[in-house]
């Protein structure tokens, strides 16, 4: 079956484009961009981040959760 519509645009790494070398766990506004509305860490295939920065991002989000800067889950009743 042939793919229809426009071809998908290749995702680029946010951190490489903006020349961010280290991801800081205290930068909550940046980390929230990579967390779903349910509080789950978004995968690389969705965000387009490189493997190196995805590992740093995961560690930073987990640290921010431990010291209560980010919630583990959100309650959207």
UniProtKB/Swiss-Prot annotation:
Task: Report the PROSITE patterns cross-referenced here.
Answer: RIBOSOMAL_S18 (PS00057)
List cellular component terms (GO). Answer: cytosolic small ribosomal subunit
Q: Which GO terms describe its molecular function?
A: small ribosomal subunit rRNA binding; structural constituent of ribosome
Matches recorded under InterPro entries: Ribosomal_bS18, Ribosomal_bS18_CS, Ribosomal_bS18_sf
Pfam families referenced in this protein's UniProt entry, alphabetically: Ribosomal_S18
The organism's superkingdom is given as Bacteria
Which GO terms of type biological process are on file? Answer: translation
Alphabetized UniProt keyword annotations: Ribonucleoprotein, Ribosomal protein, RNA-binding, rRNA-binding
Stored Gene3D superfamilies: Ribosomal protein S18 (4.10.640.10)
Job of this protein: Binds as a heterodimer with protein bS6 to the central domain of the 16S rRNA, where it helps stabilize the platform of the 30S subunit.
PANTHER family, per the entry: 30S RIBOSOMAL PROTEIN S18, SMALL RIBOSOMAL SUBUNIT PROTEIN BS18M
Q: How does it assemble?
A: Part of the 30S ribosomal subunit. Forms a tight heterodimer with protein bS6.
Sequence similarity? Belongs to the bacterial ribosomal protein bS18 family.
NCBIfam families, alphabetized? S18
Q: What is this protein called?
A: Small ribosomal subunit protein bS18
Q: State the organism named in the record.
A: Halalkalibacterium halodurans (strain ATCC BAA-125 / DSM 18197 / FERM 7344 / JCM 9153 / C-125)
Source lineage: Bacteria, Bacillati, Bacillota, Bacilli, Bacillales
| Gene, per the UniProt record | rpsR
């Amino acid at each position: 079956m042939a793919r229809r519509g426009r071809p998908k645009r290749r995702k680029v790494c946010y951190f490489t484009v903006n020349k961010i070398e280290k991801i800081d766990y205290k930068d909550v506004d940046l980390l929230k961009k990579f967390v779903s509305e349910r509080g789950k860490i978004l995968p690389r295939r969705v965000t387009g981040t490189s493997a190196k920065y995805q590992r740093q991002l995961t560690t930073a989000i987990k640290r921010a959760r431990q010291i209560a800067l980010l919630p583990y889950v959100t309650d959207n009743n």
